[in-house]
Amino acid sequence: MIRVIMLLVLVWMTPMISWATEVVKDVSGQKVEVNADQLKRGKRLFNTHCSACHVGGITKTNPNIGLDLESLSLATPARNNLDALVDYMKNPTTYDGSESIAQIHPSIASSDIFPKMRDLSEDDLYAIASHILTQAQIQAEKWGGGKIYY
């Protein structure tokens, strides 16, 4: 009887699970809902294009600066919202915002040097940014926290 009830609950919840959304913010602080398909796409793209250096939200080249919300919010300009992260993926700058690092960080601006970036559309960049911000919310300090968590 319990198995039947559990099965019925699972069947009943399946449509709700597929419509699940996460909430991230845009540059004005407005909440933006991101659906499960967008998050799945963002995760796939992140794993393909970003995880060589940012697995688990860390930054292998500078472990002091991760993709956690605190680090993103302390950057200049702040990178803790969708639009700012997309802007960074197009034209990356140093953490203090003073210099372009497009020649050493994969970006749309340097797609001639980093061919993996050539095929990314604006929607792809937003999907990746959604994945990063969602992971930062869900995993909290584990996302970008470095090897103390892995």
Curated annotation (Swiss-Prot):
<dbReference type="InterPro" id="IPR036909">
    <property type="entry name" value="Cyt_c-like_dom_sf"/>
</dbReference>
<keyword id="KW-0793">Thylakoid</keyword>
<dbReference type="InterPro" id="IPR009056">
    <property type="entry name" value="Cyt_c-like_dom"/>
</dbReference>
<feature type="binding site" description="covalent">
    <location>
        <position position="50"/>
    </location>
    <ligand>
        <name>heme c</name>
    </ligand>
</feature>
<keyword id="KW-0479">Metal-binding</keyword>
<dbReference type="GO" id="GO:0020037">
    <property type="term" value="F:heme binding"/>
</dbReference>
<keyword id="KW-0349">Heme</keyword>
<comment type="function">
    <text>One of the extrinsic, lumenal subunits of photosystem II (PSII). PSII is a light-driven water plastoquinone oxidoreductase, using light energy to abstract electrons from H(2)O, generating a proton gradient subsequently used for ATP formation. The extrinsic proteins stabilize the structure of photosystem II oxygen-evolving complex (OEC), the ion environment of oxygen evolution and protect the OEC against heat-induced inactivation.</text>
</comment>
<dbReference type="GO" id="GO:0009535">
    <property type="term" value="C:chloroplast thylakoid membrane"/>
</dbReference>
<keyword id="KW-0150">Chloroplast</keyword>
<keyword id="KW-0732">Signal</keyword>
<comment type="similarity">
    <text>Belongs to the cytochrome c family. PsbV subfamily.</text>
</comment>
<dbReference type="InterPro" id="IPR029490">
    <property type="entry name" value="Cytochrom_C550"/>
</dbReference>
<feature type="binding site" description="axial binding residue">
    <location>
        <position position="54"/>
    </location>
    <ligand>
        <name>heme c</name>
    </ligand>
</feature>
<keyword id="KW-0813">Transport</keyword>
<keyword id="KW-0472">Membrane</keyword>
<protein>
    <recommendedName>
        <fullName>Photosystem II extrinsic protein V</fullName>
    </recommendedName>
</protein>
<feature type="binding site" description="covalent">
    <location>
        <position position="53"/>
    </location>
    <ligand>
        <name>heme c</name>
    </ligand>
</feature>
<keyword id="KW-0604">Photosystem II</keyword>
<feature type="binding site" description="axial binding residue">
    <location>
        <position position="105"/>
    </location>
    <ligand>
        <name>heme c</name>
    </ligand>
</feature>
<keyword id="KW-0408">Iron</keyword>
<dbReference type="GO" id="GO:0019684">
    <property type="term" value="P:photosynthesis, light reaction"/>
</dbReference>
<keyword id="KW-0602">Photosynthesis</keyword>
<comment type="subunit">
    <text>PSII is composed of 1 copy each of membrane proteins PsbA, PsbB, PsbC, PsbD, PsbE, PsbF, PsbH, PsbI, PsbJ, PsbK, PsbL, PsbM, PsbT, PsbY, PsbZ, Psb30/Ycf12, at least 3 peripheral proteins of the oxygen-evolving complex and a large number of cofactors. It forms dimeric complexes. The extrinsic subunits in red algae are PsbO (OEC33), PsbQ', cytochrome c-550 and PsbU.</text>
</comment>
<feature type="signal peptide">
    <location>
        <begin position="1"/>
        <end position="20"/>
    </location>
</feature>
<dbReference type="GO" id="GO:0022904">
    <property type="term" value="P:respiratory electron transport chain"/>
</dbReference>
<dbReference type="GO" id="GO:0009523">
    <property type="term" value="C:photosystem II"/>
</dbReference>
<dbReference type="GO" id="GO:0005506">
    <property type="term" value="F:iron ion binding"/>
</dbReference>
<dbReference type="InterPro" id="IPR017851">
    <property type="entry name" value="PsbV_cyt_c550"/>
</dbReference>
<dbReference type="Pfam" id="PF14495">
    <property type="entry name" value="Cytochrom_C550"/>
</dbReference>
<keyword id="KW-0249">Electron transport</keyword>
<dbReference type="InterPro" id="IPR016003">
    <property type="entry name" value="PsbV_cyt_c550-like"/>
</dbReference>
<keyword id="KW-0934">Plastid</keyword>
<dbReference type="GO" id="GO:0009055">
    <property type="term" value="F:electron transfer activity"/>
</dbReference>
